[in-house]
């Protein structure tokens, strides 16, 4: 592919009178451009095994794509092919969460395969906190054994005990060829508001990157790469506001495919949408150029960008594209062998039958309506704490569910994939006023214009979506064991069971942090598995009573179907 050049197409020669700092990074008098090849992946999300085009389990071997064996074969090939152009392999985070491999084997399998081909640097994604800092710490410890550096400039531990011994740097300086290359990490600023980060918080990523870049400049580092898990929009903003100090942003989080539309290279035309050129180019007022890359997600692509720098660290030209991991891409034989015992363990654990369901446990409707999967999980939550003296209500937000469960056998794997996010099931004492407020909040639109409709047990809710936000709940009744209903009293204290994610006030449910006497319970998937085992059959009779009635729905209609998706969009 022809080199893309900006400004006038000439060879830029550095001044002989180079500043002392620049001279240390680039030998005095050197005229040739310095090539740096960035090989990058992001948002793997536990796709260790090959997948279909939709990044789900592949059942037809002739159509399988992606998988860590293809990804690693390609990275090794690129490192060899571009060995004279100073290759760096970067991982932009979110290696956790997304398949049964992670749900059953967690950090163990993730660390194992990351260590199989160590990146030169990596950052953390928000999903690395899905099982709290306690679930992250052993993963980092394993990577540190292989001296794999983890960089996040805007992460503050704040004394988080689980990460006390973890080495998370703000940046790292790598000696590449005869130059110094600084790699700064950045993570989505609001991660601590949407993930289980414990005491860890994330500061403003732009301010943190600027500050760290200034420190690197003082150390005579004039090529700076930002390894970002902030999303494409965040990366564009970063380039605008900190671009005078940085050169390339290797991105993640938004699962964006960047590719020049006129590039004659393969990509998934059926399921992937091109969101911009590879790379996106941001030109600063001082003629400084910043390049932004990203390589979709789920191991479907490996990005490769070769950038030529002059002796002052200015981008001169670039060339590259994301390589599609289609079925024709070879798989690394050694990695395939390493996958076999892990695959067998996932299959053994995942296929164990724990019960059956007579109804379709619908997940797609949960954002907009009462859904059968939500009913089941809320019932499991309430049952966890129900005894002769306590009969709690339960409330689960719609975003807590991932996969539906079809009629028939329910396996360990299906249950875990339905509720994979690793919240503990906690009980709090909460005022009726705060419970009302929390359920009302579930009928407000989030940043992606979705509701987070409350899925409840032991309650009957009526909401009118034609009303103003936070005035939409019209009534809440507490439903006793015998089915008797009594109106919720705002001045009364109730036992309420919620996921720890909500008890921590995430997703805007700050009112739930007012809960007292908090009891921390087992993982949500474990609670669901035990409840299904206890009942054995998830019968239609469990879903006869309407729990959440929504009036004047603005986006569609809600049915009470037990055999198919309940929500029908307009």
Curated annotation (Swiss-Prot):
The record marks 127, 130 as: Transition state stabilizer. Protein is mixed with the host blood and ingested by mosquito during blood feeding. A reduction in both Plasmodium berghei oocyst intensity and infection prevalence is observed in mosquitoes that feed on mice immunized with the protein prior to infection with P.berghei parasites. Immunization of mice with the protein reduces P.berghei sporozoite infectivity in the mouse skin after mosquito bite. Saliva (at protein level). Salivary gland (at protein level). Not detected in midgut. It comes from Anopheles gambiae (African malaria mosquito). It holds the Pfam family 5_nucleotid_C. Keywords: Blood coagulation cascade inhibiting toxin, Glycoprotein, Hemostasis impairing toxin, Hydrolase, Metal-binding, Nucleotide-binding, Platelet aggregation inhibiting toxin, Secreted, Signal, Toxin. Residues 1-23 form the signal peptide. A divalent metal cation 1 binds at residues 43, 45, 94. AMP binds at residues 367, 402, 507. One of its GO terms (cellular component) is extracellular space. Its EC number is 3.6.1.5. A divalent metal cation 2 binds at residues 43, 94, 126, 229, 253. Interacts with human PLAT; the interaction results in PLAT activation probably via an allosteric activation mechanism. This is Apyrase. The keyword Protease does not apply. Glycans are attached at residues 108, 287, 326, 387, 552, 555.
